[in-house]
Design a protein with these regions (language model features):
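Well-ordered secondary-structure scaffolds
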Residues: 1-181
Length: 181
């Protein structure tokens, strides 16, 4: 909820929660507000939006309008799209069994949501998983598997997409005279 924003009174707010929608960020939260991804409209709830959809427009700085809407379809990785993303099978506290960078097999238990097991949907490298102890609602994205086992090193580096988006945020701030103090 970022309720502390008003306590800190920052010069800039960058909403990079990546929830694929605006969870309450307002253009009045700071003198300069950047929204990252779909759900933000430049000039309404932020000053600028950064495009996060892979492709020709990734990292584009949008000064009027919105990012491309969320399609709900994950990007293709190693020939796999929807199958690599795991959603919560129930509502409750998550308890992880597998860890980021583990090689997992299809059907292997990765975690539990409450008492409900969460199984690997494909064989590959576990690229991401929600941290233990978090409450997750039914259907929330909780894990991501990369089918390319040989790309385990990617678990410990910053992706091309993340670098592009971060670079765009820096470009936006510097082009508006916003410098670190």
């Amino acid at each position: 909820k970022a309720e502390c924003i008003h306590e800190f009174q920052p010069d800039v707010v960058v909403d990079a929660i990546l929830a694929k929608r605006n969870l309450g960020t307002k253009i009045t939260d700071a003198p300069f507000v950047v929204g990252v991804g779909p759900g933000f409209t430049a000039g309404e709830d932020c000053h600028c939006v950064v495009e996060t959809k892979r492709g020709h427009y990734l990292g584009r700085c949008i000064w009027k309008g919105s990012a491309i809407p969320n399609t709900g379809i994950p990007g293709m990785v190693g020939g796999v799209s929807k199958e690599r993303v795991i959603h919560s099978p129930g509502t409750g506290m998550i308890r992880g069994i597998a860890h980021i960078a583990d090689i997992v097999e299809k059907g292997q238990i990765l975690a539990y949501v409450g008492d409900v097991p969460v199984e690997a949907s494909i064989t590959g490298v576990l690229r991401g998983i929600i941290k233990d102890g978090y409450y997750v609602p039914f259907g929330m994205k909780i894990a991501d598997i990369d089918p390319r086992k040989e790309e385990k090193k990617n678990c410990f580096t910053i992706s091309d997409k993340a670098r592009c988006i971060a670079g765009s945020v820096v470009e936006i701030l510097l082009s508006n005279g916003i410098l670190p103090k």
